[in-house]
């Protein structure tokens, strides 16, 4: 494994700052007659959303890989290359790339290409996949879920070091002294590991010295403090420079708390109960939603003031360096998402900075 430099795009930002990003899976909306929105239209609207996020000064924009009818993004790097040509400053990444069902060499090559097009703004988030449609689609056995990720992460780490690769494993043919192109121009590819909350995943990320992002979609974010502490302790134990700790949670910003909740709730409920039916969860309702919107809950829904206070509380409770809002949730309309993005940059971000400076 190649060590990170102490400075760089994923170095910790300090106790009085937090970076704000956005991510989306390209949730498929509804047309006026209730039929699903065409996937192509969703992708074109995503480009408008990325442009706006850049224009209002947000730090990062990520798109998550899925292979199902309710999400439009199946090839994050293709979208990110298009977004790179239409943005100037914002970092562009996946959220996440399902490494287990992909080729680590091709993942690196695609992101190094995006990095070149964007002049050094690419990053990749790697995950095992909480959705598993890619495994049968690409011919992988779910029984190999663990070994696929472990071996492919090991290979990716070697490729990322930009030296000749020597690797052997069970999941693909061996490599002996081969080089991978194109290399990155300015730095190693910023590489995150997305985790759902198991100590094993946290320790694996720390072993590689990669920054970590926790997907917090329920309960109370402060409950992740032991895992954040475990990560920091393990990074130090492995002798790596400290890296950023981030979280990802769903949410929506509108001018008032009432407007944000009433606008967001029906779309959140559709998504929550659709996924819940697939995963054996019980049905959700308004009480669960309101609890998640409370100050200690995992939904960042409300006015700019409310959302900013929740993000500042997250910073104090977990010491995170970055917060990514999953701003698309179910069939939430494009116009509502655009307003939410604008408010995140123009109202939430300055309020968070004010709260953390005080």
What is the predicted role of each segment?
Residues 1-87, 91, 189:
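N-terminal beta1-alpha1-beta2 module of alpha/beta enzyme domains
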């Amino acid at each position: 494994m190649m060590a990170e430099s102490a400075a760089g795009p994923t170095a910790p930002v300090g106790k009085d700052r937090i970076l704000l990003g956005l991510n989306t899976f390209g949730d498929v909306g509804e047309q006026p007659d209730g039929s699903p929105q065409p996937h192509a239209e969703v992708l074109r609207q995503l480009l408008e959303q990325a442009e706006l996020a850049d224009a209002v000064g947000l730090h990062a924009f990520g798109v998550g890989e899925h292979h199902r009818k309710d999400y439009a993004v199946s090839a994050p790097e293709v979208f990110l290359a298009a977004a790179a040509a239409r943005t100037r400053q914002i970092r562009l990444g996946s959220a996440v790339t399902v490494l287990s069902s992909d080729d680590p060499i091709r993942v690196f090559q695609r992101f190094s290409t995006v990095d070149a097009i964007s002049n050094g703004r690419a990053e990749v988030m790697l995950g095992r996949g909480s959705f598993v449609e890619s495994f049968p689609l690409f011919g992988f056995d779910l029984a190999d879920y663990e070994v696929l990720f472990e071996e492919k992460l090991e290979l990716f780490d070697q490729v990322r070091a930009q030296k000749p690769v020597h690797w052997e494993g069970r999941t693909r043919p061996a490599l002996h002294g081969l080089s991978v192109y194109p290399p990155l121009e300015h730095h190693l590819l910023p590489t995150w590991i997305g985790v759902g909350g198991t100590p094993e995943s946290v320790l694996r990320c720390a072993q590689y010295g990669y920054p970590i992002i926790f997907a917090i979609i329920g309960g109370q974010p402060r409950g992740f403090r032991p895992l954040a502490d475990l990560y920091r302790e393990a990074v130090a134990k492995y002798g790596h420079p400290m890296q950023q700790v981030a979280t990802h949670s769903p949410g929506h910003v509108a001018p008032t708390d009432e407007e944000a909740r009433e606008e967001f709730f029906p779309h959140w409920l559709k998504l929550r109960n659709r996924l819940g039916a697939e995963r054996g969860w019980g049905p959700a309702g308004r009480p669960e939603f309101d609890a998640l919107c409370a100050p200690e809950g995992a939904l960042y829904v409300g006015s700019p003031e409310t959302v900013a206070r929740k993000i500042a509380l997250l910073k104090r409770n977990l010491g995170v360096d970055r917060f990514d809002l999953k701003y698309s949730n179910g069939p939430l309309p494009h116009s509502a998402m655009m307003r939410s993005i604008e408010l995140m940059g123009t109202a939430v971000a300055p309020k968070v900075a004010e709260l953390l400076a005080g």
